[in-house]
């Protein structure tokens, strides 16, 4: 038997079937770096319209985790897709480099400031440590395939950025937003510092909840207020309820709601006052069965009544506040303005003292009666003891409730009044302006707007000062007597900023005030506080986005995890509005957190942590990138080894599709061999039209940041339109027709258009694989797919031509029906080419199918395909309902004809040629004649 293998156009490509991504990706990265890929891309994109994505800086401490990987990959997908859409989309990565976590790490190495090391040496060590962390994280981010200016990232500890951070503070001061105040702030005794809102986490905690009697000083006055002449004897007390007994030494008042009804309740030989709605549950808790309401009044009627502190020798007033609720307790709120935000606000109205008997270490100050030197959390038991001894305790019980904790130490925090610097939310109308600015921004998902509006509406003034060493200084001089800022503060801030540009923050810490103030120095105190790190990152719109030539304000997009509504999105918004009256961004996109396959939070103790480093070292970065793109990031993002394995399977489908296309473009030179649409076969025009429809979906989804839709559509295109139909059908034409025939060049033209488009669809997501594909596509090309824009060579199928989209949709439907019957043959170890198919249908469908003539068999991939009227169907024909509501009857039989060894079709004309007796007629034509003619498929 003659071997006809050399007469076939068998697929050939250098593009390997296996990705071997873990090995190949680092080689590609090294090549891109050597070729200065990012720099060249900037040159290619110069002059295009800008797209600015501002990078929220990760903290320069520790290894990157899967959440970091998700964030950086999403940003990279956006930047690359905007580049392909024709924008100049630079990416400047950044790092947050100051603050407590770095201090804690450095303390472990060299000790605490003032003990083992001086402050300047400590800050130097912090800078060195942060730089090491940046270098480590930078390598991990680059390994993910993230393209950016890794040689010139921004660091919040860069001298220039530190200087511009100080200038940003100066601008905020000039516009009237800074204030000094003794206010209660979140305070972590372990940090020894105030915490920002974003540094507070709420966790469940068991506390001592107590109900306490505050004796009424003038009982007759109170009875008059309750419209009572009197009801027996016995003391009258207002009962408060609190879960922080340790704050009672700082009590200055008891607060009631002006519009609630309060009841005077007779219990045994005493009378208690509390909210009427809470009388029944309270008496039940106390175990008082003989309680009887003897009088009522509105809260407003009790304003100004005097009570006696339960264990200190002082009177406290009844005051009114809208914050009092009936959710728990008694409706009477113990008020200590030094230990709570609501207490502080209501206390301002009544001129109450902001008393804070607690030191920065969380211990009561010397001179605090009863409790001096005790830790506040340990003092709860002692407070209860003192109350019990004085007969002031009604009830003490344990309560499990949500309580603020330090995000670093995971320990309960306290509210503590301290002298701090604040960005005021009311002064100069910052809150009002910020709420207006929020409405000008596009929030994705949309619920983000309501979330940040709620947070900005309800948030307290922003405490921006910290009592730390490693941070940007608050470079102010305060008059020792008046407490006012130096009158030349703007000029002084600029002078300090210029010094910081040259020497870093050490320029402030080592500064002798006389150098700037001259003889005034003796009258002023140099502020030693540092800025909250959320201020550092929050002003990057001014220190980075507005300063780097390739960026610019406002940023088109901020993209971070959904926790950043209370973090970076908010600190950026407030500082930008404070500085220039507008938001720093046009759109804000948030992604959910990563969880395991069961929806559980990841933790080392559960053993469910997925480390990005391990994923890229085993599966490759493109698999991780594909998982990110395939997952709806608007909700929680589930990841596990099994999920990543499924992602790798999907990757293989797309890779194999690309490989098939490339392998069948062997010998094709687009400049020489590409056909015009009118010269192409209808099936090939249909394939290009399908690719165009996919491209419209893909580019639209990239624009809307709906990456999971891209994954679904492209994967589906590879599996269904291409894998299950088009590529299957054209194999025969590709392999068996003459190499330079119109039939083959038509299919190659379609495949060329498809791979040119597809490589661009994949490039933002499968960055390594796309570049690998790019190098193998025939024809002249530049060095990177990213140096191009979306492919413009696709074209639509003319709806007026006979073989339009509806025609091919019908063919697909028929083919599926035939395939179901073919499966029975395959189960018997036969192929569809071993079969002959008879189709029985109504006239309209028969006309459609007959339109393909002899070529129907190629579409159905069978040796013979015959069309008959429905009425002539035999009993063993199998009925299949079609999409249009009609029926098709199919009969599949084994062919009795000989099999052509070249095309594997069973044909009756085998042996007709004496020169090639084994071949079928068309193979003879393709081997020895002018080649077969194909008109449709």
Curated annotation (Swiss-Prot):
GO BP annotations, alphabetical order: isoleucyl-tRNA aminoacylation
Motif ('HIGH' region): 58-68
EC number: 6.1.1.5
The keyword DNA-binding is assigned to this record: no
Keyword vocabulary terms for this entry: Aminoacyl-tRNA synthetase, ATP-binding, Cytoplasm, Ligase, Metal-binding, Nucleotide-binding, Protein biosynthesis, Zinc
Binding-site residues, L-isoleucyl-5'-AMP: 560
GO molecular function: aminoacyl-tRNA deacylase activity; ATP binding; isoleucine-tRNA ligase activity; tRNA binding; zinc ion binding
Principal localisation: cytoplasm
Matches recorded under PANTHER family: ISOLEUCINE--TRNA LIGASE, MITOCHONDRIAL, SOLEUCYL-TRNA SYNTHETASE
Record's protein name: Isoleucine--tRNA ligase
Species this chain originates from: Thioalkalivibrio sulfidiphilus (strain HL-EbGR7)
Highest classification ranks of the organism: Bacteria, Pseudomonadati, Pseudomonadota, Gammaproteobacteria, Chromatiales
